[in-house]
């Protein structure tokens, strides 16, 4: 699921972009959901170019192969590097930032509030609650992202590949403030929206799993 490759396949002409870029090094497989349909398309695509070093699975990612594990690994590095270089051909878009407070809250201040709001009562567990472990990220790229003026728009357009939704859900929670009240309200709204989303799209045999957010964006924090 290389991000650079998905940045190419997810464009309106993504298939052609990848075909032009890779030539006979990799063959492009049209999108299909994971399962039999995708497997059939993969088999057909490989038959059309048996000497290729990889398969571009549109909106999924890249599969590379070779006679040895080392050869397969080297093919992966080569093909992803080509995608990374191709992405740089485009124009760089600068995202305008919001005006941040002079003294924004720190992760150590926000973390306990998040853990408390995400805890769920469960009398079968020690302490009577099911709790979560948070992992914080706040490098320069992430801070530019979460501090963007249009964060509420571009953060909600969906994951770059359906496979990510297994771990992250389809969209993150964007906090409108880092007070206890704002965090509690934000999580409650997320759960409500996710539950409604599940009810709209579920099949009769589906059971909803944990409706809590898996990724939380806090402007000024991370």
Where are these regions (language model features)?
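Glycine-rich flexible loops
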Residues: 2-222
């Amino acid at each position: 699921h290389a991000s650079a490759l998905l940045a190419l396949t997810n464009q309106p002409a993504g298939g052609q972009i990848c075909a032009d870029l890779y030539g006979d090094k990799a063959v492009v497989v049209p999108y299909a959901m994971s399962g039999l349909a995708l497997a059939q398309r993969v088999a057909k695509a490989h038959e059309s170019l048996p000497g290729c070093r990889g398969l571009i699975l549109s909106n999924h990612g890249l599969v590379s192969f070779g006679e040895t594990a080392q050869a397969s690994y080297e093919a992966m590095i080569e093909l992803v590097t080509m995608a990374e270089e191709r992405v740089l051909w485009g124009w760089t878009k600068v995202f305008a930032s919001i005006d941040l407070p002079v003294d924004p809250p720190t992760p150590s201040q926000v973390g306990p509030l998040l853990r408390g709001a995400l805890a769920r009562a469960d009398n079968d567990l020690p302490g009577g609650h099911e709790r979560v472990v948070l992992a914080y990220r706040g490098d320069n790229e992430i801070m530019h992202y979460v501090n963007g003026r249009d964060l509420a728009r571009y953060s909600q357009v969906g994951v770059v590949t359906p496979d990510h939704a297994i771990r992250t859900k389809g969209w993150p929670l964007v906090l409108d403030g880092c007070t206890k009240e704002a965090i509690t309200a934000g999580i409650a709204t997320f759960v409500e929206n996710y539950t409604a989303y599940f009810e709209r799209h579920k099949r009769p045999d589906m059971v909803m799993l944990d409706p809590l957010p898996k990724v939380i964006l806090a402007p000024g924090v991370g």
